[in-house]
Amino acid sequence: MSPVDRLREALPDAARDVRLNLQAVLQGGALTEGQRWGVAVASAAAARQPALLSAVLAEARSRGLDSAAEDGLAAAALMAMNNVYYRFRHMVGKPGYTEMPARLRMGRLAQPATSRADLELFSLAASAINGCEACVRTHEDVVVKGGIGEEAVHDAVRIAAVIHAAAVALEAGEVAGGHEAVSAA
């Protein structure tokens, strides 16, 4: 049984739909396997649920998708910073802040382990979870202009939504005391 399958089985009964959706979104669709698992890693890291991230990382690496996994982790880390900063600028809406340089290092965006378009796709998923409208719009535009179609973008956001829901369900199950902590091993 794969790490993600074990994790799915650990989801509480209240999250049956999430369990089924988690299986569905990680199969087939308009994304390549690397894109699918890079999005899953970025989403799991952005959702901040250790057992979920551990399972998704183990699954991606077991499939030989180390570059996608590394870019997924990089995207989540960068978006944790950028989404706060750019969401602030967008929410305040004052031209003065928009004109100030960010002065935040983002060199990894220029040096992906996969491709620029894939790293942007992973960043889009993390940004959707983090709720940065300006970031979502920017990443979606770059991804589509980079040759990844809207159907693939839609699949990526579906993965992000389900991964986020799985993180919430796992945490709720732990708090409710109905399930033991999940291990990816």
UniProtKB/Swiss-Prot annotation:
One protein family per Pfam: CMD
Keyword Oxidoreductase: yes
Disulphide-bonded residues: C132-C135
Any one Gene Ontology molecular-function term assigned to this protein's record: hydroperoxide reductase activity
GO biological process: cell redox homeostasis; response to oxidative stress
Entry superkingdom: Bacteria
Keyword Oxidoreductase: yes
EC supergroup of this enzyme: oxidoreductase
EC numbers, comma separated: 1.11.1.28
Catalytic activity: N(6)-[(R)-dihydrolipoyl]-L-lysyl-[lipoyl-carrier protein] + a hydroperoxide = N(6)-[(R)-lipoyl]-L-lysyl-[lipoyl-carrier protein] + an alcohol + H2O
Keyword entries, A-Z: Antioxidant, Disulfide bond, Oxidoreductase, Peroxidase, Redox-active center
Known function: Antioxidant protein with alkyl hydroperoxidase activity. Required for the reduction of the AhpC active site cysteine residues and for the regeneration of the AhpC enzyme activity.
Protein name in the entry: Alkyl hydroperoxide reductase AhpD
Organism: Anaeromyxobacter sp. (strain Fw109-5)
